[in-house]
Amino acid sequence: SFTLISTDKAVRPTNVMGASKRIAELICQAHAKEKLDIKLDIVRFGNVLGSSGSVIPLFQKQIEAGGPVTVTHNKITRYFMTIPEAAELVIQASAMTSSGDVFVLDMGRPIKIVDLAKEMIKLSGFQHYFSDTPNQVQHKTRHIPISITGLRNGEKLYEELLIGNNPQPTEHPRIMKASEVSINISDLTFHLTRLENACNTHNLGTIFNILNELPLEFNH
């Protein structure tokens, strides 16, 4: 069997990275319809706590440096899962799939990133305060500044786990099966060939046109 590790950023993507993840899902779904000898499934992760590139190691470094701890927006939220939860999702999905399924983990309520920053500062023995800019902070004893830097291009205030509205339960109480749109292999191959040609010629306009034509719900 083959398991694609996808991301919640594939759901109604607002940037090219998220769009590429949704395209990878479509490729797996299309090949699954071809009744191959291999079972294919897809698992969507939120943020994995403690993994390389996650926000917690970044915040730890910023706190150790005396701040500021940088957050892009005071209302931004993200879903989080632990490394054991992520590993369990992959293993369980491989066991449950009938090929072409998209699995997501019930990760509970999303967490405000600014609240995570505050809690990490507190657990490190400091108090937080807010600074207008990351480069102009007031140095206060036992205090760490939090700086709101503004949303990056293509960054969402909140992530979604499902494109469709009717997830199906599975035998695992915390794993759902998503009902997502797919595309047949011939149509997908046609679009991907055009996309490859547009990338090779650096034709940005055509690239975005193709991303909008594919069933990604791309909103850049």
Question: Would you name each region that the model predicts?
Answer:
Residues 1-25, 30:
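Conserved Rossmann-fold NAD(P)-dependent oxidoreductase catalytic core, especially the SDR/UDP-sugar
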Residues 26, 30-220:
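Strand-loop microenvironment adjacent to phosphate/nucleotide-handling motifs in alpha/beta enzyme folds
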